Amino acid sequence: MAKRKFPDLLHPIGGCGFIQFWKLYFNNWPYTLYSLPSRLLSLMAVTFRIPSVFFEKIRHKNAINSQEIKDGPIFIVGHWRSGTTHLHNLLSQDDQFAFITFSRSLMPLDCLGKLRPARALMKIMMPKNRGMDKVAIGPDTPQEEEFALAALGSVSFLKCLYFPRRIEEYFSSSVFLKCMSEQEKESLKSAYLYLTKKMTYANNGKTMLYKNPACTSRMSLLKEIFPNAKFVHIVRNPFEVFPSMMKLW
């Protein structure tokens, strides 16, 4: 029998706000003893960040709310394992675009400061690459915004991975618009608008470049939020996508 792997201590829900954390926590009860270390560390991270979340809100709230989104955003969409990450990494080299970094996506509520302690911890605890394809990752590399949506309390495909016992429910409610309630749609709209205004403000008005396979079926909703949004749909041979997806899972 294979030895059970020790759980990852750096869990993304540690980047939530205090209220969002407890909502996620109690909505997905019960948990196993196996996950206790990562749950405790996540709670410590959330509690430790309360002052920085509060002061960032006070300092930047008005500027973020008044930030205009003139162009875009641009969304890279397509099925998982179709090359969205590679295309995102390539296009993010263009200075006319701004992207959300790994650290900012994980901690969207307090990401405008220097985040020195959090970034230092991420460098120590994060793997150097994504295990399934060896793509390099780090606190400052481009990342998809789905982490931020989950941390902001919106619907998010990543909750399928955070809470796998409810994978079918979370997949349907985060990917298929017809399965979303009006409340879930509004939470997604609110989170996207807040995040895009904040990232546009943080990047001096540059057009945001997002990458998110889950948005392939959200395009009509995203057009309601951002009338000037543009989409880049990348397609890969399905006979290559399928085995790649099997390897991923």
Predicted ranges, named:
Residues 5-51:
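Charged, amphipathic alpha-helical linker segments immediately N-terminal to NTP-binding catalytic cores
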Residues 54-76, 105-109, 114-115:
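N-terminal signal-anchor transmembrane helix
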Residues 74, 98, 230-232:
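Hydrophobic/aromatic beta-strand patches that form the interior of the parallel beta-sheet core
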Residues 76-93:
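Glycine-rich phosphate-binding P-loop
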Residues 77-79, 209-213, 235:
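Short His-Asn-centered micro-motif
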Residues 93-103:
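Post-Walker A helix-loop "phosphate-sensing" segment adjacent to the P-loop in P-loop NTPases
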Residues 104-208:
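PAPS-dependent sulfation machinery
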Residues 211, 222-247:
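Conserved phosphate-donor/acceptor-positioning beta-strand/loop module used by diverse small-molecule
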